[in-house]
From Swiss-Prot:
It catalyses: an [RNA] containing cytidine + H2O = an [RNA]-3'-cytidine-3'-phosphate + a 5'-hydroxy-ribonucleotide-3'-[RNA]; an [RNA] containing uridine + H2O = an [RNA]-3'-uridine-3'-phosphate + a 5'-hydroxy-ribonucleotide-3'-[RNA]. Its EC number is 4.6.1.18. Residues 1-28 form the signal peptide. This is Ribonuclease pancreatic. Residues 33-43 have a biased composition (Basic and acidic residues). It comes from Saguinus oedipus.
Amino acid sequence: MALEKSLALLPLLVLVLLVLGWVQPSLGKESRAQKFQRQHMDSDGSPSSNPTYCNNMMRRRNMTQGRCKPVNTFVHEPLVDVQDVCFQEKVTCKNGQPNCYKSSSSMRITDCRLTNGSRYPNCAYRTSQKERHIIVACEGNPYVPVHFDASVEDST
């Protein structure tokens, strides 16, 4: 009798495990928009002349785990202003895709570049503050930045 009850519950258990197998990989997985924000947004941090800014931020934002990310840019503007870039001048991305947009005004950014000779796990970065137009790739609904493509000087 107990064996029959156990066998009757087996299909239900299999179904639950299948559903968990389907759902679980998406739980806790960072969306492309969330990854963009983690890797590129620092609205609260004003750009400073602190030479260790990049070393600290790259480590804090998990871009030195397993390898040293060679180049990264942080944007020091409100998130809504960066999201608005998705509705500004359309440009072609470096990889040839048509979903990049250039900001209509300059934005405060910090460029972080891995210094020569720096090797994992001792990632060391050169910090440089700039005011530049940013180019981001956008996608999704809502249409938001998912990739930082470049920064360019004002052409005027």
